[in-house]
Amino acid sequence: ATNEHFKDKNSFFIPSSEMMYLLPNQVAVALSQAQSIPQADVRTKMQDAILYSLKSEILREKAETDCSRCLIDTSPFFSGGTHLVWHSTDALIVPVRTDQQSINSLNLLLKLFSSPASEFRRCMPSDGHMPKIQMVVLTHCGWSTRAGARNEPNQQTRMYIQQVLDIVSRNIQSFTTNDPTNHIVLLDDFLGSGRISSARSEPIELLHAGETMTIHRTKVEVNKSVEKVKNQLRFISSCLW
């Protein structure tokens, strides 16, 4: 099916699959079998073929569709797929919500990258490829309502910004530059705009304040903050490409 909002663009979408739930076990079995091969050169070749299998498919698809960019949305629940994605990327974008559980998840991710004992580090491609993080997007940020305040995070958001900054600083080797401030961007809660965008499969860039839609018998509205969100998303895009 074609998304009408992308009809004039050279863009293609490859959906996920319920088979992704089986992939972690399949990848683990394949890597285990490859590691048991006695000939070192054959063993290395097989491991590289497995770890770079998704990258090979992406490069083939890009050539066939004449696309220059590829974005992959992955999840820790698809650990095998996530493992292959990490070896397919030039850089990672890590969304972190303004809550402690998300902060803990960021710490866990960076530990997976840095610890030699982690599942991810135990089996590496022969060229030693390690993914680098380009950006941590701190989502659902709140802003000060103090008179005269402009684009000033509220106290709770400032607390999470500081935590993320500390984490990035301690793990700067996992990022694409040596300056922690290059890698943290803030994003508002999308509110109704996000729900309508998802329901319609329509980019937020095309939404306008005042639009309404009924979702699960609840009336949802695009509020005025959508213009601020658009600017934030444009800035994030400019930092990526």
Pin down the residues of each PLM region:
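Aromatic-enriched hydrophobic runs in primary sequence
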Residues: 1, 9, 56, 64-76, ...
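Cytosolic-facing regulatory segments adjacent to core modules
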Residues: 1-7, 12-72, 78
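Phosphate/oxyanion-binding active-site loops and adjacent basic polyanion-contact surfaces
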Residues: 42-54, 101-109, 225-240
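Conserved catalytic-core segment of NTP-binding enzymes
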Residues: 48-174
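C-terminal lobe/tail of nucleotide-utilizing enzymes
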Residues: 123-241
